[in-house]
Amino acid sequence: MNKILFYLFVYGVVNSAAYDLLKAPNYFEEFVHRFNKDYGSEVEKLRRFKIFQHNLNEIIIKNQNDSAKYEINKFSDLSKDETIAKYTGLSLPIQTQNFCKVIVLDQPPGKGPLEFDWRRLNKVTSVKNQGMCGACWAFATLASLESQFAIKHNQLINLSEQQMIDCDFVDAGCNGGLLHTAFEAIIKMGGVQLESDYPYEADNNNCRMNTNKFLVQVKDCYRYITVYEEKLKDLLRLVGPIPMAIDAADIVNYKQGIIKYCFNSGLNHAVLLVGYGVENNIPYWTFKNTWGTDWGEEGFFRVQQNINACGMRNELASTAVIY
């Protein structure tokens, strides 16, 4: 059963207070103007409108039934498959070597604060935009190292995703990669440069890294099997922000609030866990995304805890230790 039919089956057909499906043509023209869309032909424009209309219907249904809110945004004329193919990039091969040490977190969660967020301690760097390059794995990996550097040295830095795309021969650049193999590649490369020394191009290119300009070096990496989702709270406070794998299909049109309904049809995107809290008696996780600050809650999103939202527990969480 697809996700739209699931919502209809459980809740019935509803109307959104914010959007009216009958006004889809008007919304679409506003969308085309706002995002400067040029489809090249009326045939292609009509095709995009039909996709837009389908996405609008999903937005309306979700807005009525989820605690989060969804909106028409820059992805609204793309099918979910197109968005996943162009704007994510997590690849999950059938088998990978355990270069990073695997740790099983099988003890019950400890007693910690009800709320915690590394952003409040100024240990999370600015939200970036990967664009149409499947390098979420590089962004999430380096975002965790940027935070580790900030925790250790009290300084925010901006590391080079382009170096990872060009010089990480374990992963596949804009064609995808994995979190733990990215850490493996950094250890093998010897370190990572600043983005200012190796700027982002959103495309695969020849490796041009300068080992004399490495700012961050990784000495160890770990993968965690979490028996209890709540155990991630202890891990987050202990090691810093954690890169994790999710299925991004249900967050594409997200605007704000806590997502209660995020299914997992296959992991495809890497994001960074930065905090957790409680709002209106709903416990949530906070993630940093890589789709720019014009998406979601200024580039961040929240999901309900303890429901394996977006499949967040289906792949091992990965972290690394810097020198």
From Swiss-Prot:
<protein>
    <recommendedName>
        <fullName>Viral cathepsin</fullName>
        <ecNumber>3.4.22.50</ecNumber>
    </recommendedName>
</protein>
<keyword id="KW-0788">Thiol protease</keyword>
<feature type="active site">
    <location>
        <position position="289"/>
    </location>
</feature>
<dbReference type="GO" id="GO:0008234">
    <property type="term" value="F:cysteine-type peptidase activity"/>
</dbReference>
<keyword id="KW-0732">Signal</keyword>
<feature type="propeptide" description="Activation peptide">
    <location>
        <begin position="17"/>
        <end position="112"/>
    </location>
</feature>
<feature type="active site">
    <location>
        <position position="269"/>
    </location>
</feature>
<dbReference type="InterPro" id="IPR025660">
    <property type="entry name" value="Pept_his_AS"/>
</dbReference>
<dbReference type="InterPro" id="IPR000169">
    <property type="entry name" value="Pept_cys_AS"/>
</dbReference>
<dbReference type="Pfam" id="PF00112">
    <property type="entry name" value="Peptidase_C1"/>
</dbReference>
<feature type="disulfide bond">
    <location>
        <begin position="133"/>
        <end position="174"/>
    </location>
</feature>
<dbReference type="Pfam" id="PF08246">
    <property type="entry name" value="Inhibitor_I29"/>
</dbReference>
<keyword id="KW-0865">Zymogen</keyword>
<keyword id="KW-0325">Glycoprotein</keyword>
<feature type="active site">
    <location>
        <position position="136"/>
    </location>
</feature>
<dbReference type="GO" id="GO:0006508">
    <property type="term" value="P:proteolysis"/>
</dbReference>
<dbReference type="InterPro" id="IPR013201">
    <property type="entry name" value="Prot_inhib_I29"/>
</dbReference>
<dbReference type="InterPro" id="IPR025661">
    <property type="entry name" value="Pept_asp_AS"/>
</dbReference>
<keyword id="KW-1015">Disulfide bond</keyword>
<dbReference type="InterPro" id="IPR039417">
    <property type="entry name" value="Peptidase_C1A_papain-like"/>
</dbReference>
<comment type="function">
    <text>Cysteine protease that plays an essential role in host liquefaction to facilitate horizontal transmission of the virus. May participate in the degradation of foreign protein expressed by the baculovirus system.</text>
</comment>
<feature type="disulfide bond">
    <location>
        <begin position="262"/>
        <end position="310"/>
    </location>
</feature>
<keyword id="KW-0645">Protease</keyword>
<dbReference type="InterPro" id="IPR000668">
    <property type="entry name" value="Peptidase_C1A_C"/>
</dbReference>
<feature type="glycosylation site" description="N-linked (GlcNAc...) asparagine; by host">
    <location>
        <position position="158"/>
    </location>
</feature>
<comment type="similarity">
    <text>Belongs to the peptidase C1 family.</text>
</comment>
<dbReference type="InterPro" id="IPR038765">
    <property type="entry name" value="Papain-like_cys_pep_sf"/>
</dbReference>
<dbReference type="InterPro" id="IPR013128">
    <property type="entry name" value="Peptidase_C1A"/>
</dbReference>
<feature type="disulfide bond">
    <location>
        <begin position="167"/>
        <end position="207"/>
    </location>
</feature>
<keyword id="KW-0378">Hydrolase</keyword>
<feature type="signal peptide">
    <location>
        <begin position="1"/>
        <end position="16"/>
    </location>
</feature>
